[in-house]
Amino acid sequence: TVRVGLVQWQMRSYKTLDDLFEQVEFFVDAVSDYKSDFVLFPEYFNAPLMSKYNDKGESQAIRGLAKYTEEIRDRFINLAISYNINIITGSMPYVKEDGLLYNVGFLCRRDGTYEMYEKMHVTPDEIKSWGLSGGRLLQTFDTDCAKIGVLICYDVEFPELSRLMADQGRQILFVPFLTDTQNAYSRVRVCAQARAIENECFVVIAGSVGNLPRVHNMDIQYAQSGVFTPCDFAFPTDGKRAEATPNTEMILVSDVDLDLLNELHTYGS
C-alpha cells in the first residue's frame, strides 16, 4: 500500500519566497505527519510571487517568476530529505538553455535525487499571454514505493501520453492542475478519471483555490482535488477513492493498493 497526500493550495499574497515556503513547509510537514509516501502540489502554485512584477507585461512577469524556479527546486529537495517524503512540486515556469520558456515541475525523492517533467501541450492562453513553449520530455519515474508519471493539467486531456506511460509500467499518475472555472476543472477531472479506467492505474489530481489580486492572468481558481481508481470489483464503484471539499484549502491523504492493480491487469472484468 502506498499513501499519497495532496495539497489543495489557497492562492494568497506572498511578498517573498521565504513567506511562500513557510506555507509550503507547513503542508509538507502536515502530510508527512500522516506517514505519506508522496505529496503533490498544484500547477503554478508559486504564482503569487508574480505580484512583484505587476507593473510589467504578462510575458515579462512570468519570466520574472521563472527566476525563482531553481531555488524552489533546491528547497523542495531539502524538504524531501528532511521530512522523508517524495515531493511532486506541481509546476512552475522555467527558462531552458535555448532561451525558451517552459512549464515544468520536479519529482524530489526523499533520497535527495530529483527528476524534471515538462508540460507538452501548453494551453492557448499560456502561448498568447506568456509565450510558453511545449516540452518534449515524456517519461516515467522509479521511486522507493511505486512507478509514477506526472502530466501537468492540459496534458491529461490527451490519452496518448498516459497510454505511453502505462506501457512503461506506471502505477500512479499525478496531475498538478490550475483551472479558473468549473467547466475547465471538469475537463481535467473527467479526463483524469478516464485515464484511470483505460490504463488501469491510480490518478491523483491537485489544484489551487481562491483569488489572487495584483497578478494578471491569475485572478480566480477553482478546484476539487481527488484520487481516482479503475472501476472494477476491488475498487470504489464510482472510481473515486477520495475527494477534497471543493474550493477550500486543505490536504487530502489516501491509501492506494498497488496489488489490486496487478490483480486487475490479470483477472479484471
Listing of model-derived features with the role each one plays in the protein:
Residues 89-90, 103-107, 139, 205, ...:
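Short beta-strand scaffold segments in enzyme catalytic cores
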